[in-house]
């Protein structure tokens, strides 16, 4: 059968007096199904506890079924603290204390795949105990020997010294996430983040209330397609609140993300009706989709 390209070329050749045409078979654009890195089913879903800032919060998250936790990290002159707001009164637990508690619980049999460090001020210090290098040192001293991997999160990596420090010395237990829309994330990983291995590239996107960011579902779908086509390793969405089962379904089903941050809108994680209910939304969704999704085990490697 003569291809459309040959017919068009022949017509144009007649008009322009071109000597000959080459028959190039018609080709459809590359589809997601043709990409090489699409996760096999059933794929693991990571339930990530939001804004865990205390040892009690770590314990509660594990009790609720979280298999990863997100800790906001802020550097002060005295070092790194589990601190979201960066106010003199907002950080009460050091990074070291948080990491030691995670390691203790993991060694006691708790399943935590990774700790996501949402770094609020990665460029606060170039060296010393307030530098990103020191935060990494603590993670490697306490978390990684216990079998807990680390995800370093950045919101503005373009001109960040801290981002480059993590990027340049990344080991196999660590990965990097950028919080931005899929198009901007693509530029980061094609530019300043291009040396990061694909499996260790993460894209995350979300808001304290997904109601105010309705385009997020399509955008995260594009990030998941980038994962399927081997340009990033994982895509995560946030934040799932109690009663938002339709958002869980859309993010895990339509958007195809690998995990969800869940919890409350703007408070530290604790044992409460709201956090328990939000965690249950994810676990129940997985139970209802056993052919395509599953709870990860400690043997699963997120990167």
Swiss-Prot record:
Listed Gene3D superfamilies: Phosphatidylinositol (PI) phosphodiesterase
EC number: 3.1.4.41
Native source organism of the sequence: Coccidioides immitis (strain RS)
SUPFAM superfamilies documented for this protein: PLC-like phosphodiesterases
Primary subcellular site in the record, as a coarse category: secreted
GO BP, one annotated term: lipid catabolic process
Cofactor(s) this protein cannot do without: Mg(2+)
Catalytic activity line of the entry: a sphingomyelin + H2O = an N-acylsphing-4-enine 1-phosphate + choline + H(+)
This protein's record includes keyword Metal-binding: yes
Active site, renumbered: 50
Key word Cytoplasm present: no
Cofactor, how bound (note): Binds 1 Mg(2+) ion per subunit.
Similarity comment: family membership: Belongs to the sphingomyelinase D/phospholipase D family.
Enzyme class: hydrolase
Protein name: Sphingomyelinase D
Short sequence motif SMD-tail: positions: 296-303
Cellular localisation: Secreted
Assigned keywords, A-Z: Hydrolase, Lipid degradation, Lipid metabolism, Magnesium, Metal-binding, Secreted, Signal, Virulence
Domain of life: Eukaryota
A molecular function (GO) term: metal ion binding
CDD domains, alphabetized: GDPD_like_SMaseD_PLD
Function text: Catalyzes the hydrolysis of sphingomyelin. Sphingomyelinases D are produced by some spider in their venoms, but also by arthropods such as ticks, or pathogenic bacteria and fungi. They might play a role in pathogenicity through different mechanisms, such as membrane destabilization and host cell penetration, but also pulmonary inflammation and cutaneous lesions.
Signal sequence annotation: 1-21
Record note on domains: The SMD-tail motif is highly conserved and may be responsible for structural stabilization.
Positions annotated to bind Mg(2+): 70, 72, 118
GO cellular component: extracellular region
């Amino acid at each position: 059968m003569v291809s459309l390209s040959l017919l068009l070329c022949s017509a144009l050749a007649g008009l322009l007096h071109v000597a000959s045409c080459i028959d190039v078979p018609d080709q459809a654009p590359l589809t997601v199904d043709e990409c090489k890195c699409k996760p096999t089913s059933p794929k693991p879903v990571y339930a990530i506890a939001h804004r865990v800032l205390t040892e009690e919060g770590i314990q509660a998250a594990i009790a609720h079924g979280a298999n990863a936790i997100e800790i906001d990290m802020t550097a002060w002159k005295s070092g790194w603290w589990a601190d979201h707001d960066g106010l003199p009164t907002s950080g009460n637990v050091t990074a070291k204390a948080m990491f030691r508690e995670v390691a203790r619980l993991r060694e006691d049999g708790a399943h935590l795949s990774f700790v996501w460090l949402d770094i609020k001020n990665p460029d606060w210090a170039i060296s010393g105990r307030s530098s990103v290098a020191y935060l990494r040192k603590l993670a490697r001293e306490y978390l990684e020997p216990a079998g807990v991997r680390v995800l370093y999160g950045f919101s503005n990596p373009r001109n960040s010294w801290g981002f480059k420090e993590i990027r340049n010395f990344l080991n196999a237990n660590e990965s990097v996430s950028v919080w931005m829309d899929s198009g901007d994330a693509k530029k980061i990983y094609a530019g300043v983040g291009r040396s990061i291995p694909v499996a260790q590239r993460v894209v995350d996107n979300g808001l304290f209330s997904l109601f105010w960011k309705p385009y997020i579902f399509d955008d995260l779908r594009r990030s998941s397609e980038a994962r399927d086509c081997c340009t990033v390793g994982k895509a995560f969405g946030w934040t799932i609140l109690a009663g938002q089962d339709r958002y869980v379904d859309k993010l895990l089903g339509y958007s195809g993300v690998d995990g969800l941050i869940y919890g409350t809108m703007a408070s530290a994680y604790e044992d409460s009706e709201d956090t328990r209910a939000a965690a249950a939304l994810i676990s129940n969704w997985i139970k209802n989709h056993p052919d395509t999704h599953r709870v990860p085990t400690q043997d699963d490697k997120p990167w």
